[in-house]
Design a protein with these regions (language model features):
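Hydrophobic transmembrane signal anchors and adjacent membrane-proximal interface regions, especially
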Residues: 4-6, 11, 54, 61, ...
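Short, surface-exposed beta-edge/turn micro-motifs
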Residues: 13-15, 25-30, 78
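Short, compact, well-ordered microdomains
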Residues: 64-116
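Short, charged/polar N-terminal "headpieces" of proteins
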Residues: 1-23
Length: 119
């Protein structure tokens, strides 16, 4: 599993990875985990996505860029986000729907690491 360094709200994290899960109706959910600067303990950093009622493609998610202001540009730099096809309204906020490169996402995913050792 590849890891990355991430900075959010003036806090630096290292050895970060995505936990890829699913919301109730099968839509992808992403959470970021990693270590705060010099700490070796892994902790939850942020939920990156928001569950919505709108129909999304299998490789689309809604990014919570209100809580994670630099996340989309960061995901673009990693090659995980391919495009931003539209926006949706969630609790009075206009949030972007992004198209993901799932192969690239899974390179940084805890789930992929578990599957590798399970086979």
């Amino acid at each position: 599993m590849k890891t990355f360094n991430y900075e959010s709200n003036c806090v630096k994290y290292k050895n970060c990875f995505f936990d890829v899960g699913e919301y109730e109706k099968g839509k992808l959910s992403l959470a970021i985990y990693g270590c705060v600067e010099d700490d070796e303990n892994v902790s939850h950093i942020s939920n990156a996505t928001v569950n919505v009622e709108e129909k999304l493609e299998e490789n689309e998610v809604v990014i919570d860029n209100y809580a994670n202001t630099n996340l989309i540009s960061f995901l673009l730099d990693l090659g995980i986000v391919k495009s931003i096809p539209k926006k949706v309204t969630v609790k009075f906020l206009r949030l972007p729907v992004v198209e993901l490169d799932l192969d690239k996402l899974y390179e940084y995913s805890y789930e992929q690491e578990v599957l590798k050792y399970a086979s």
